[in-house]
């Protein structure tokens, strides 16, 4: 697999790996070998990310978090060779080789949990990030929640705290379908 492709997949999914969860199978990155390529997925029980090929699953493994972070550091350019055995995985990129044991467990059925997008709003990514950051300044320090109201060509972002301080931001959007939902702002910013 091209190094840039694997590194990109790790960057798009690695943030969702659990750190020290008692459900040990969440403390890593699930890598599936599929008929048309590979797919990566990760979840910490609150958020989930996956990307890659969509063909039939031929093999599925869970690589520990520390090994994934080390792999992403060693991958630079060229091609990456991934060798999988029953108990471990070896990743080779140029002169660098990393070997680790696999996590023995069953990764959650992420495809069943995935939300199909029936509500869509298209906006400028940086404007949304900036609006989320500004609105979250006055959010509850413990929960850091923001409310998004999507409608009529705009995304309204609001937050508040126990002292009745409130913040509101509006981001222009297109192709909006109405939706009102509350989110932990950190999860939105990570995505």
Which residues does each PLM region occupy?
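DNA polymerase processivity clamps
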Residues: 1-103, 116-191
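Specificity-determining recognition surfaces
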Residues: 109-110
């Amino acid at each position: 697999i091209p190094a840039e492709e694997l590194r990109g997949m790790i960057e798009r999914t690695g943030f969702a790996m659990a750190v020290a969860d008692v459900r040990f199978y969440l403390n890593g990155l699930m890598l599936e070998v599929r008929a048309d390529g590979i797919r990566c997925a990760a979840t910490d029980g609150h958020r989930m990310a996956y990307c890659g090929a969509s063909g039939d699953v031929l093999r599925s493994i869970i690589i520990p978090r520390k090994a994934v972070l080390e792999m992403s550091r060693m991958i630079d350019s060229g091609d990456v060779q991934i060798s999988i055995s029953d108990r471990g995985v070896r990743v080779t990129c140029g002169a660098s080789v990393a070997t680790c044991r696999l996590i023995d467990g069953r990764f959650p059925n992420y495809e069943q949990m995935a939300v199909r997008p029936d509500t869509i709003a298209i906006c400028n990514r940086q404007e949304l990030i900036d609006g989320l950051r500004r609105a979250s300044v006055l959010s509850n320090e413990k929960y850091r929640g923001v409310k998004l109201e999507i409608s009529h060509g705009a995304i309204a972002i609001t937050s508040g705290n126990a002292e009745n301080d409130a913040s509101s931001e509006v981001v222009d959007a297109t192709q909006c379908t109405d939706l009102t939902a509350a989110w932990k702002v950190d999860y939105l910013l990570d995505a």
